[in-house]
């Protein structure tokens, strides 16, 4: 599910939300579709030119992430210039060059407005394999973060649901491929419980050899769906069994507590009356 404009409209796109920047690096997008399209267009153009001029040099995943962030910053700078400096007859260049003749308060105010200029929210996972191995980066309005050590990343409104599945499975970067495939699919399906997450699922695989990018087709996705549903049924059955065990256990505790209370009541009746607090305790004990 992608978001358009001010976030008031959400829609399921007819195109995949992942895009192969190279045959070894893929971008997965979440958030505002307009800003994502604008960034992606420029990033893809730069990468294509890089491949054309240096066809034998593999692009690093980190370089792709830095490029994505750099393009976003340029777009933000240009929009801020048009919205804030444009009405004043200024550009970034003339604003910087003319600061000596401007009041300090004016410069500080404009600088603050430029730095805090609002942009649409977006998140992008850039993942792939380069000559240094496999990598996972997340680029957003707030910078670049590397998730190589963690071994997984999730973005969008369903990210917490997906992350919880990876955490519960104790997933790491050394996990086997067969474990990761089903876990990834199941995490996506569980994330559909979150508002704004659509049912459409796109999957791909990169590696183990650099330059190998494979789109997971519909037949495989259908098989994964069957496996996921069987897993869900097993989990639901296990939960029902556990609830039944807890019910029987608490019932047993209640019965034992009732017997104990009845026994205490009987001893009180046999003894005549229950002693009050402090009763039978002498304030003047005699020496024997």
Predicted regions: what they are:
Residues 1, 118, 122-129, 135-137, ...:
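Short beta-strand scaffold segments in enzyme catalytic cores
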Residues 137-139, 151-152:
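Domain-length cofactor-binding catalytic modules of enzymes
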Residues 177-181, 190-205:
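Flexible, glycine/charged-enriched surface loops at secondary-structure junctions
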Residues 131-133, 143-144:
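Short acidic/polar capping segments at secondary-structure boundaries
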Residues 112-114, 191:
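Generic recognition of flexible, low-complexity loop/linker segments
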Residues 122-126, 189-194:
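A short, hydrophobic secondary-structure junction motif
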Residues 1-110, 117, 144-182, 197, ...:
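Conserved short S/T/G-enriched processing/targeting/catalytic segments and their helical context
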């Amino acid at each position: 599910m992608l978001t358009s404009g001010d976030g008031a409209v959400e829609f399921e796109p007819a195109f995949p939300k992942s895009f192969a920047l190279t045959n070894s690096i893929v971008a997965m997008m979440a958030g505002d579709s307009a800003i994502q399209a604008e960034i992606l267009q420029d990033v893809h153009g730069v990468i294509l030119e890089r491949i054309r001029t240096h066809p034998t040099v593999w692009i690093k995943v980190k370089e792709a992430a830095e490029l994505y962030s750099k393009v976003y910053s340029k777009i933000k700078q240009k929009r801020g210039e048009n919205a804030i400096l444009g009405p004043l007859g200024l550009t970034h260049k003339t604003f910087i060059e003319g600061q000596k003749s401007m009041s300090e308060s004016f410069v500080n105010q404009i600088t603050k407005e430029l730095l805090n200029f609002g942009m649409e929210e977006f998140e992008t996972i850039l993942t792939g394999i380069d000559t240094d191995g496999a990598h996972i980066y997340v680029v957003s309005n707030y910078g670049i973060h590397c998730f190589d050590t963690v071994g997984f990343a999730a973005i969008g409104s369903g990210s917490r649901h997906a992350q919880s599945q990876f955490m519960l499975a104790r997933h790491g970067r050394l996990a086997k491929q067969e474990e990761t495939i089903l876990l990834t699919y199941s995490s996506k399906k569980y994330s559909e419980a979150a508002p704004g997450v659509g049912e459409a699922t796109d999957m791909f695989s990169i590696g183990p050899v650099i330059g190998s990018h494979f789109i997971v087709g519909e037949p495989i996705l259908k098989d994964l769906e069957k496996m996921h549903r069987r897993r869900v049924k097993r989990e639901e059955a296990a939960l029902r069994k556990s609830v039944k065990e807890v019910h029987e256990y608490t019932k047993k505790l209640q019965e034992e507590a009732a017997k104990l209370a009845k026994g205490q009541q009987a001893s009180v009746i046999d003894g005549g009356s229950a002693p009050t607090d402090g009763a039978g305790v002498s304030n003047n004990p005699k020496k024997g």
